[in-house]
Amino acid sequence: MNMRKLTILLMLIALWFGGSAQSLKPATPEQSKKMVETINKATSAVKSIQCDFTQVRQSTMLKEKQTSKGKMSFSGKNLKWEYTEPNKFALVVKEENGQQQVYIQQDGKTKKADGQSGQLFKGIAQIVMGSVTGTALSNSGDFTVEMYTQGTQWIAKLTPKQPKLKKMFTSIHLYFNDKHNAVTKVEMKEANGDMTTITFTNMKLNS
């Protein structure tokens, strides 16, 4: 391929991806208010969720992406995050005395998750549970919320305001389904530059 053809090809690629990026449109303040109200109303009717998930983590320290798969179940204020591939273990979030506690279940044993890993999952659990119940969008003390549209899909960009969350994440994107009552994908950009993307499939609500 000569230089001229290569230059044209690169320009076309740039235009293609540039056009794709521009398809994410920020909502107006009026639209954002109505979108958040619609999501809160829709999610308030969701009492339980069961689904599969695929988690892809891109670390700044590693060249290859790390992919995990599993199942998630949510009911009330409790969340179970069960990994089935490549390793088998479960993370369980329970509310005890008004505070979220994280436990690890593996090889028939249960232990409390402490330290950095426990704090990280508490943050993830807070985001997932907040998106399910709608509190992540309505609680202005935790996040600054910006709403976007991409075709018919609604996307919420959350920027943490709480010091604990700011230490873990710089931004979170929530992708909602067509009924706006559940999140189908979560993108979390961590403060250290790592990126975690969680995609939910085979979702069952209130089953």
Regions found by a protein language model. Give the residues of each.
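A mature extracytoplasmic/lumenal domain signature
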Residues: 55, 83-87, 95-97, 106-108, ...
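An acidic-aromatic
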Residues: 69-126, 196
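An N-terminal domain-cap segment
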Residues: 48-72
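Hydrophobic h-region of N-terminal signal peptides that target proteins for export
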Residues: 11-20
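Sec-dependent signal peptide recognition
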Residues: 4-10
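Flexible, processing/modification-adjacent segments and terminal tails
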Residues: 23-28, 35, 40-45, 57, ...
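Gly/Pro-enriched, hydrophobic low-complexity segments
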Residues: 21, 136-207
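Extracytoplasmic
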Residues: 46-48, 67-69, 76, 86-88, ...
